[in-house]
Amino acid sequence: MTAPSQVLKIRRPDDWHLHLRDGDMLKTVVPYTSEIYGRAIVMPNLAPPVTTVEAAVAYRQRILDTVPAGHDFTPLMTCYLTDSLDPNELERGFNEGVFTAAKLYPANATTNSSHGVTSVDAIMPVLERMEKIGMPLLVHGEVTHADIDIFDREARFIESVMEPLRQRLTALKVVFEHITTKDAADYVRDGNERLAATITPQHLMFNRNHMLVGGVRPHLYCLPILKRNIHQQALRELVASGFNRVFLGTDSAPHARHRKESSCGCAGCFNAPTALGSYATVFEEMNALQHFEAFCSVNGPQFYGLPVNDTFIELVREEQQVAESIALTDDTLVPFLAGETVRWSVKQ
């Protein structure tokens, strides 16, 4: 990696956790990812969710149809696990190169997850098949019992779901997505080579004070929710250490402004336009820019068993102001860090 003080040249990154939605929203947001990233793991929580090979093929084509000319971008599709999913369908999709991974949403944990899994036991035949064929499991790691505090749901998931699952299926490859706690950072660091994690820019840059002190900031509201500063610091220390089983996953999750700024707002940060520069800022603050390229462009492909990208991009260190909003057909999108001045941005 070449790192003069004002320019960072890195191998083209990938986004290992991304929501692109569908319809007009899809057309609006895809270019913000496809101009920067070579590949992205695309989340399957549409309505209805992507649970068949045919649905994934059709969705992949809708994505590709929106990629601007000149962008070299490959969407990596995922299967939404449900209690009734046929293991043979999953294996067929994996063998045919349609499904790269499968996603476990605990029922009602996040946006469009009402079809999610009610218990791990309900999908054990599917998970056993995934272990057998080497298909990665992507996990939204929160329990959803009504009596468990929202700030405790990730830590409780580790002890009640994740660890028993990994003890039972020892060869299963697992990505603990968008980790937000010291508990999860320690768990992944102490795990073996079959356990990895993604971290979002918002969980590295902010904690719950930023979202709640001096007024509620709905555009920082995402799930898993921002935690206290000791957890934020643990995540920052994990990425700054150069640990090779943690990698870039923005969890960019667009919602129209009126669905965020409401009396019952949706969870999700649309960070695709600003994520890479945000990560660079964090690595610079942690004096860890020497590990930035691996986090963005190497660790993910290594875990998935895929080649790294063979092209490069540059980030420049110069102050730029983020747009206040982005036009949608009948509304607007508010990007992560809207209206703020950022230090790093992708060179156009």
From Swiss-Prot:
One term of GO molecular function: zinc ion binding
Source species, domain of life: Bacteria
InterPro entries in the record: Amidohydro-rel, DHOdimr, Dihydroorotase_CS, Metal_Hydrolase
Annotated catalysed reactions: (S)-dihydroorotate + H2O = N-carbamoyl-L-aspartate + H(+)
Residue numbers annotated as active site: D251
Subunit-level organization: Homodimer.
Job of this protein: Catalyzes the reversible cyclization of carbamoyl aspartate to dihydroorotate.
Protein name per Swiss-Prot or TrEMBL: Dihydroorotase
Record lineage: Bacteria, Pseudomonadati, Pseudomonadota, Gammaproteobacteria, Enterobacterales
